[in-house]
């Protein structure tokens, strides 16, 4: 389901002119770089089905015009993501960034405040836009109703996701609210 939401967002959302640049350039035959940057939902084999499906669908339609990088890392949150943003993301010069860390920021052992996810997302958006003002940026957040141990370790997930919603609105980027 997250795969379909992202795919639909990339092809139909026109929040700002920059949000359509990725697709316009692909249609013109220009090469584009896609970077996935998240936690377990984007990297673990059992969770990243949506990443693989999106990649397959884009490759099928645009064949050799796209380079993909999955720079995600399991068990990390926005602190690691911001500290490693230059090496993990900016070094690859993405035209499309799909990222999200609120599900791990909300884990109680990390001792983060809910506003933290949104502020870190803003930092990453600002840094990518400084490098590539035309980059298409997609921020994803996961279900506010996690099950089992995930629910126990993330009692304030809704507040963390809310800070990401605010950041996406403030920065004019695509939000996939799964």
Language model feature labels by segment:
Residues 39-44, 72-76, 104-106, 144-147:
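Short histidine/acidic/glycine/proline-rich micro-motifs that form metal-
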Residues 2-12:
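Sec-dependent N-terminal signal peptides
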Residues 11-14, 116:
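Residues within alpha-helical transmembrane segments of multi-pass membrane proteins, especially transporters
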